[in-house]
Amino acid sequence: MNHAAVGDDILFSRMSLHGGGRGRQGLVRTIIEYFSHTEYQATREQVERDRFVFFGLIRCQPWMVIPAGIIIQFCYGSVYAWSIFNDPINQLVATAPGTDGAEVTFYIALGVLGLTGAICGPWIEKNHPRKSGAIGMVVFYAGHLTAALAVHMRMLSLLYFGYGFVAGVGLGIGYVSTIDAVNKWWPRARGTASGCAVMGFGGGSLAFSALNKWLVDNTDLPMAFLILGSMTFAVMLLSIQFMCPPPPGHNPDGVVVVDESETWQLKQPDAPHTAGEKAWGGAKGTPAPPQPRQRQTLSVSLSEALRSRDYWLLYVAFLSNIVFCLVVISNLPRLIDSLFGMGRAVPRSPPMPTYIAVSVEGAFNMLGRVLVGALSDLVGRKTVFLLLLLVQIIVLIFVPIAIHVDSFWAFIGLIWTATVCYGGGFGMIPAFLADMFGINNTSSCHGIILTAWSIASIVGGMTFTGVVNRFLSDGAHAYDEKIYVTNFAWILVLIVIGFVCCLFVRASIRDRMFPALPNQVMRLRIFGRVFRVLSVRNGRLGGAAEPRTGSWRLRTRFVELEYLTKAEEQTAWEEYLALRAVQHRLISEQGVC
């Protein structure tokens, strides 16, 4: 067997330190150090303080972090109601009639959110959630204050910097830190926990679209941003007092090595207290946080996770899942008005006010996040993710038909259905990453995968707007079907690509890290068993291979096909785990990782 991949981290570190120049070496070393240590190390005093929340007045209970996380995410989700500000800002700030620019602010904010999550992920993982969360909310508030100044001065560039960049940085830090804190408390139901947390973010447009509409109608724009920012800051400041990390030993150290038949089990009442339970005063009569039973785990470093092809296949699948609704969310009022309202060739009132449609879309966004996350706990992350992509493919096929037959309710129903899938992707992706790469890598992996959000919001949004503007400049009207058929066509192709990528994601730790033979060409799992294709050179196997019995084998002049038995697979897997454990211990003793 070839176990060269076991020492990849050592090789990665050594090669990185042989760059040209001492300054470059120092920079590379700093970056490697930053992304190599992603675990929060609490002192004994901090663990003791975390037994109480809300300024030390209330004993912490695991359930408290979920409503606190929902409220915080709900405030951050106000960004989803940005479309209400587009027309008023364009009318106030536009430099020429018909010029649109406010929409770009939304794309910049979500783009910066993803980049901030990627850069700050390791820092968030290593720090207390109240610290990172407080920084996120302060920066988010500063973005609102800058936006108020920008609209007062009628400067689009300052608006892009204030709400787009500054508030986007606050969004990135606050979004990732809140989800990470909630996710760590519930190792047995990560999909449900993370879905509940991000449910608040998806529901932001549900309330804030109506609130923003009221502010626009009853105040001037600078005051609207001052009120909105101050209100969300005050609510988050109180809610974050209930956020704290779980006690030591609450989560498995690494990725749990499981068989498909294994399930989580609660500790029996007479089981001895774990270190985590003792740290939180697990005395008689005091319910301790539920603990998973002890199982074998496999430590996966962040560099291993990021160099895994499965991570990047999931990255493409995630990007594909969000791009459709992401461009629709910021353009829904315009779509309704152009296709079914006053912007039509024959103007009429739309069947539903646009701000209500945005609010209902937020409700479906919120519903999808929690329901899909919970469903993934029951039937598996990969299966559910494939279903989300498939539903969106069907939606994109029928949306142009709904537009062509002038059916508003069919159109809006399809959009809301896709919105459930959009929210569901966000709800389950933190749990998907934690299952695949370990809880200590979740913030970093989640932050980096959120750059797909950046790409989808900036590139996808700009492409959508660019297609519309190109048709308009060529003499088309905003109600012309061909504008939207063209846009939906390229989005459909992207989602199909994402579906194919998701098919090839190896969600199981065994499938990802099962040892490969030196002469192995490819490997896949068929009906629960490993099927391998081995190369044959000059009539001999391309590498040393030990005799195997019991497996089905077919040998030709160039390749050998092998279908392993369950027993052979288990033997090879146990040998790999044993070697991996020895390697990890040696590396730890040498202080390399």
Tell where the protein language model's regions lie, with residue ranges.
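Helix-loop-helix hairpin linking two adjacent transmembrane segments in secondary transporters
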Residues: 201-258
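Intracellular juxtamembrane helix-capping segments at the cytosolic ends
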Residues: 89, 171-186, 193-194, 336, ...
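Extracytoplasmic gate region of multi-pass secondary transporters
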Residues: 82-89, 297, 301-372, 457-465
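Symmetry-related core transmembrane helices of the 12-TM Major Facilitator Superfamily/SLC fold
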Residues: 223-242, 484-504
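Central cavity-lining transmembrane alpha-helices of secondary-active solute carriers
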Residues: 104-124, 359-371
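C-terminal ends and interior cores of transmembrane alpha-helices
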Residues: 138-152, 391-404
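Hydrophobic core of transmembrane alpha-helices in multi-pass small-molecule transporters
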Residues: 143, 156-173, 319, 409-424
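Long, low-complexity inter-transmembrane loops of multi-pass membrane transporters
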Residues: 2-54, 234-313, 512-593
